[in-house]
Curated annotation (Swiss-Prot):
The lineage of its organism: Bacteria, Pseudomonadati, Pseudomonadota, Alphaproteobacteria, Rickettsiales. This is Small ribosomal subunit protein uS12. Belongs to the universal ribosomal protein uS12 family. Residues 110-129 are annotated as: Disordered. It holds the Pfam family Ribosom_S12_S23. It comes from Rickettsia bellii (strain OSU 85-389).
Length: 129
């Protein structure tokens, strides 16, 4: 505990918070261009082929981005919208592609959790009674 005189001479230092998605530069989303689409294997206890893209963001930074959902339409040179969000079992992947934005289609046939996968709402047909 500092004395009163110590606080007069040196003010308290505030804690520096470290961001988990530095390439976004405090923005919720950034747009970018897809350079490479590839599959990556996860860390030890898990086994799969996770879909990952390398994207050059509008601020000239290059990042690895996870493509969520089943089947995707991401190709090289596609424009993508990137949000923060780590993938726990993929080292170095700290960002997600936003499906249903720009050149990327949403997941087809999705009924639950549609907003996360860019799936449109099913149209209900009115019936006469």
């Amino acid at each position: 505990m500092p004395t009163y005189n110590q606080l007069v001479r040196f003010k308290r230092k505030s804690k520096v918070r470290k961001t988990k998605s530095p390439a976004l530069e405090a923005n919720p989303f950034k747009s970018g261009v897809c350079l490479v689409v590839k599959t990556v294997t996860p860390k030890k206890p898990n086994s799969a082929l996770r879909k990952v893209a390398t994207v050059r963001l509008s601020n000239k930074r290059t990042v690895n981005v996870y493509i969520p959902g089943e089947k995707h339409s991401v190709k090289e040179h596609d424009r993508v919208l990137v949000r923060g969000g780590q993938v726990p079992d993929l080292p170095g992947v700290k960002y997600h592609v936003v499906l249903g934005a720009y050149d990327i289609a949403g997941v087809k046939g999705r009924k639950q959790g549609r907003s996360r996968y860019g799936a449109p709402r099913k149209q209900v047909v009115a019936t006469k009674k």
